[in-house]
Structure formats: structure tokens, C-alpha cells
Amino acid sequence: MEFTIAEELAKNQKSISVAEFFEKNRQILGFDSAPRSLITTVKEAVDNALDACEEAGILPDILVQIERTGQDYVTVIIEDNGPGIIKEQIPKVFAKLLYGSRFHALKQSRGQQGIGISAAVLYAQMTAGKQTKILSKTGSGNPAHYYELMINTSTNEPDILKDEIRDWFRPHGTQIELEMKAAYVKGRRQSISEYLKATAIVNPHARITLIEPDGNEEVFERATDKMPKPAEEILPHPEGIELGTLMKMLHYTERQKLAPFLRYSFCKIGLLTAEEICKASGLDPEIDPHALGRHEARKLIEAFEKVKIMSPPTDCLSPIGEELIYRGLEKETNVDFIATSTRKPAVYSGNPFVVEVGLAYGGKLPKEEKISIMRFANRVPLLYQQGGCVTTHAVEDIKWKQYGLNQPGGGVPVGPAILLIHVASINVPFTSESKDAIADIPVIKDEIDLAIKDVARKLKHYLSKQSNLKKRREKEIIITKVLPKMAVKVANILEKDVPDINPVVAKIMGNLLVHRKVKRNEDGTADVVIKVKNFGTSAYAFKVHEMLPCTILGAKPEPKVVTLGNDYDYVWDISAAAGSSKVLSYRIESTTDKELGTFPDLVVEGLEEELVTGAKAFKGV
């Protein structure tokens, strides 16, 4: 009886394809709601476009267009100027899950599993019942190949519904068009616009255009023409390798001896290190790796831990860099202060990684709300599961009050700030297949903590400086109200002209004094002398701008001249130690008394206005 039941059960047992599995478990890949399904689709297509362009050395120019095709349906069109895809590969790239080129590559990349874009194709055919349209071209002399595809979920193979050649204006690139059940939302952090804005910040070399369903066009311009440093593929590192993985490597290696196997299968193992590992494991360097079993593999794992092996190389990573993080934040935010920090590469379980942080503060950011945390992994925004991410946990564990931000009740601080956190690695440890959050790996959390504290210290310094400038400003307002009245009264008593009070104000405030004196000569020319005196206690480096509608003669020292239409901007670079003075002089021809009295204000670039008396001032970048 029991045998009969077992036989009956056996009849119902069969294997399923990976496509069938994801068909029934689409939420695993981020297709669990209408708004999120659209964001996931755009994310996967944009990731592919950026990766393809970077691998080909092409500055990315990406178009994302969303059209409403029904009450609950949208059509998504994503187009790029990448290298294109050869004809034979198009069906498999878009309509076969777990098909890709990066799964076994140990280097930083946005996508690895070969699931993303084909999962979007699967979701589109499940919810709208329509095929996905692909157009791709590999060069100006080559035809554009057009496909209409669906996925056969029983076999995880592409069903080709249409295959033809078409004309396309682009010299090279790829376009994908999908119709699906989804919702386009605006005005919140988890939206297409915010996702693309975040993508533009950490990919400042890309130009991204969004055309919304209402026809509104939003362009995220590139901030640099410099391509990211390409990530180089590396061999596995012995640290953190698992027993089963090592046994598989031993079984399938082409090497016939253990020592060469170690040298050429792992990074940072040379001849001497390989011999040390063999000695520590008690294994003969000449033994055939294929003859080693589980017991010997375990000995090798133990030897890896005993022998000092150099950390893996970091050229497999492509960090954004502090300068480009600054440019990205500056381009997409309107703030008063930006600080950045890039940590040195570190290692977890043999995987190199690097942490980068940017902090933007002030401007029109809300003061009474929690700061905005922008999370990224390998230059890809993470929009969901913020509370379950190591980046958020690191932010919450910092005592922000000592850096100038309120933290009522602990957790994420409150204030007008955006905190950008980027983790780049050959293997980012996500908490799930949907890649929404990074796992709590202690060494990664430590690096995030150190990077955040670095920018937080810079923020503290900035806020302290702003507080001091505010006090100076308030003091100067009082002085400039009182001194003129005193000067007028004293001048009346002594029956003399009212003196210039700027030198007195500068001396009391400890400011930089800039004073221009013009003397008319009998021949119609005029001599101009600009005196600069530093009454402060610090050395200053700055520029003095004199903007005039005429050329000058005999300038000492010689300024840099910038033509501005019919006017000229004369610029002197000056360094002034505490208590020192500088003199600038020049002559102008044929001026009337009226013209001499209408000189524009001198401008000091490089110092806050609170530190300068007698001229306009701006800090600059």
C-alpha cells in the first residue's frame, strides 16, 4: 500500500524551469506592486545601458520614456547609445533568465546574475500578455535588428515572434519597449524621477532624459566627460573561500600539480606562498589536484588561514571618487555645503570593497525632517528596505548631536541634509535577490561608519565657521550703525570732513580692508591705487576683481585680464599674511571727474563677505 502511494506521488514530481519559478515568485525580484514594478523595469534597463556604454568606452546618453496605455497599464521605452547587441544574442539576452556575461566575473558591475531585464520581459508578458520589442544596432555600417520576443516559461527559452531588419537613425545602440501593468507616481522618493536623479548623481558621466506620461521632459545633464576607470577582472582570493567551492575548483582545474593550481587559480599567491600553503597543509606540491578529496580540501582551507596572504587587488573596483561625487551632488541639489569622503579599499570574505560618502547641507532642504539617506551599491540606487540596510544602521548608530545635527530619540538625525552612501564591491552582500538592502557585515559597517564620521567632522567645522560668521555679522551691523553717527558729530565739532570709517571698522572686526584711491592728473589721466590690509589673525588667499569699461596702463603687479563683452575684468591673485598689506596700482587715460566718481565696487573672491570691509565679497567654489 505504501509503495503504491509512493509511486503515485512520484508521478507528480517533475522539475521546473527558473522562468516558471520566477513567474510564480515575481516579488523576489522586485515586482511586488504596480509602482515598484515600473521602477524595477527602468532600473534593470538603465543598469544594462550604463554597463554596456562603459564597457565600450562610450559616454552614456539614455532616454527613458513612459506612456500611459490604459488605466492600469504603461508602455516603457528605454533607449541608449551603447555598442548594441549582435543579432544572435538578442533573444537570449532579453528572453532567457540567468543568461549573462558577468556572473562568473570577479569585478565590480551593476548586474551579475543575468536575471534583471529578462525578469522585466517576463513581468510584462504576464501582466499585459504582450511581447517585448527590441531594436539594436552594432555600428553605422550594420543593419538594425528588430525582434518581438516572449519567454517560454516551461523551457526558459525565447519565443521569437518577429525577426526583421529596420532603418534606425542611431549609429549604434539598443532600444527596448515593454507594455505592462504598472503605475507611474510623482512627488515621492520612490519614483522614476527620483531614481534617475539619484542615478545621475553617482554616474555624473551619463546624460539621462526622462519623458513622463504627460509629455514633460526632464534632463539630467552629465557633469563630466571623463569615463569611470574600468574595473579589471581578478581571480578569487583564498580568504573566505568555502569548502564546496574549493572542491569544485580542484575537480575542474586543468593544472596537474597542486602548487601551480594554487598559483594560477587564486590572486595574490606566488611561488613562495604556494609552497608555504602546501607545507602548512601537509600536502605534496606535486600532487594531482584532481586526487584531493574533502579531507585534503579542508586542510587547504585551514592553511589559507595560517599563511599570510596579501589582500586582493583593488583594480577590480571602480569607485566614483570624491571630486565626481561633489559634482554630482552639486549638479542635482541646491545646497550651501558639500563634503565628500572615499575610504581606502577593504576586504570582507576575500571580496574587495570600497565605501564612499557625500553630504549635502543647507539650501532649501527641510530643516524639521529627518535627513535624506541616498543608498547606492555599485552605482545603483537602492530605494527600498532602507530600514534593513547596513548603511541606515551605521547612520543610526552615530551620535549626530556632536556634529551639529539633532537626533531626538536616536535613529536617523533631523536637519537640512542629504547623506549619500555608496558601497562598491565585486560581490555586494545583498539581503535578498531584489537587491534592495546590504547585509550587516561588520567590516562593511565599520567602513561606512568611518566615512560618515569623516564628512560629519567637515560639517561640524562648517557649522562652527558659520556660527562665528553670524556673530561677526551681528557685531559689524552694530558697529556700522554707531560709528558713522560718531564720525559725523566729531567732524561737525572739529569743522572737518567726515572721515572714511572703513579702516576703523576693519581694524575693530579684524577684517580684510580693501580701499581704492583715485588721483586725477593734469594730463587727463588718473592714477588708481588699491590698498589691501589684513587686520585678521589668519593668512588669506583670494582674488581682487576690478571691472572697468576701459584698458589700464602700467599695472603693478600685472593682473590677469578677462574680456566681458565691452568691459574688462582685471584679476589679481593675492596672498596676505596676518597684519600684512598689499598695494595694487594702475593708470587709466582720458577720464572725466564724473567717470572717476562712478567706479564699480571692488570684488573679493575667495572670502566670506563677513571677513571683508570696503569691497563686495563671495566665497566661490
Curated annotation (Swiss-Prot):
GO terms for biological process: DNA topological change. It is an enzyme of class 5 (isomerase). It catalyses: ATP-dependent breakage, passage and rejoining of double-stranded DNA. Its EC number is 5.6.2.2. Belongs to the TOP6B family. NCBIfam families: PRK04184.1, top6b. HAMAP family: Top6B. Homodimer. Heterotetramer of two Top6A and two Top6B chains. This is Type 2 DNA topoisomerase 6 subunit B. GO terms for molecular function: ATP binding; DNA binding; DNA topoisomerase type II (double strand cut, ATP-hydrolyzing) activity. Keywords: ATP-binding, DNA-binding, Isomerase, Nucleotide-binding, Topoisomerase. It holds the Pfam family Topo-VIb_trans. The gene is top6B. ATP binds at N48, D80, S101, R102, G111, Q112, Q113, G114, I115, G116, I117, S118, K435. Relaxes both positive and negative superturns and exhibits a strong decatenase activity.
